[in-house]
């Protein structure tokens, strides 16, 4: 058993030794083959690298040679071009030298001719001075003077002709424009009426209007400032007042009282207050109406109200609002005919008399007041100038201001447009009221009875009873010294204390 194992081990050992030996021999042989093959590959690679190296060197030499040859050819071409350019420059230089010589020769020739001409000119000038007996300066002055006189004569003749043609054409053109404008406009003619008539249902109503001891008629006259005349006119009462606003308030109030039938001082006061508010609203509506008719927008409320007040104002018998509207239409048409600013001309013409609708105690004329109001209304400076210059109080600054003056003159000069007697009468009554209202403590003054009576309402807190007579005398003396009037003027002072209490 042991022997078998030993034999087996020996056999295994021998087998392993033989296998290892065979493996070593095979590896050595294979390594030798690989080395030979690697050496062969290396030799081939070296040969190929050497071949490529020679090829690259050869190509590089050929490239360098080609570049060198090309550079040499380029250099030869540049040298040839430079030589040709140099030859051309030399030729040009020679030509310029020749031309310069010719120019020098011609310049010398011209100088010689110039000197010869100067000598000839001097000789001829001396000969002319000897023949004419005038020196050069004298002859020049004589010629200039003759030419100047001739030019002045021709210029004056041309100026005269232009002025004559311009005057003729301007007059004809202005006439055509005015005729065309006046034909395009139609204006209502309104007269200044200082009295209104209120129809009564019966004669008995006159007694109710007068009231017990005249209380009703006195209250109506005191509240409205109008003169209520109850005479023999059948079924009619006459209301007289120079202020159209107060006359309108009195007329409407009396008509409503007659229609209502309740006529007593308290009812009269209530109706007058309500009618006063309605008339104030009508004033604003009249201003809006004329603005709408003329197509004017962006007017401030105070301006609209001032325009509306012109509806109740008259100037020489002419309604001021209608007059302003007519002037605005005329000015806009004139502006369109001559190419001026139509909007500015129309706006300035409408506002030119707005100062007459401003309630103020200032002694300035209506043009100054209107110009100040237009400036406060942020109107265009040309509109402000047109308002202030329509009576030449200031210098017009633009053609639109002149157009407003022309349109104002056309409207005022239209036959039947104005009546001066009525305006003088109204002015006298306004001055009469202004004198009384100028005293301290006077609240309101009304001229009635065609200016023969002045009723003055005084403040009972400022004027006690003991001073009423003295105030009346002062007002009468002031009227005597400041106004001229026919007959006598009755001054009546009214001082009233009213106490109102409520029982609860």
Curated annotation (Swiss-Prot):
Function: Endoribonuclease that initiates mRNA decay.
Record-annotated HD domain positions: 320-413
Organism encoding this protein: Treponema pallidum (strain Nichols)
A Pfam family annotated for this UniProt entry: KH_1
Gene Ontology CC: plasma membrane
Listed EC numbers: 3.1.-.-
Name of the protein in its database record: Ribonuclease Y
UniProt cross-references to HAMAP family, sorted A to Z: RNase_Y (MF_00335)
Domain KH: 194-279
Matches recorded under SUPFAM superfamilies: Eukaryotic type KH-domain (KH-domain type I), HD-domain/PDEase-like
Transmembrane segments: 2-22
Subcellular location: Cell membrane
Family named by the database record: Belongs to the RNase Y family.
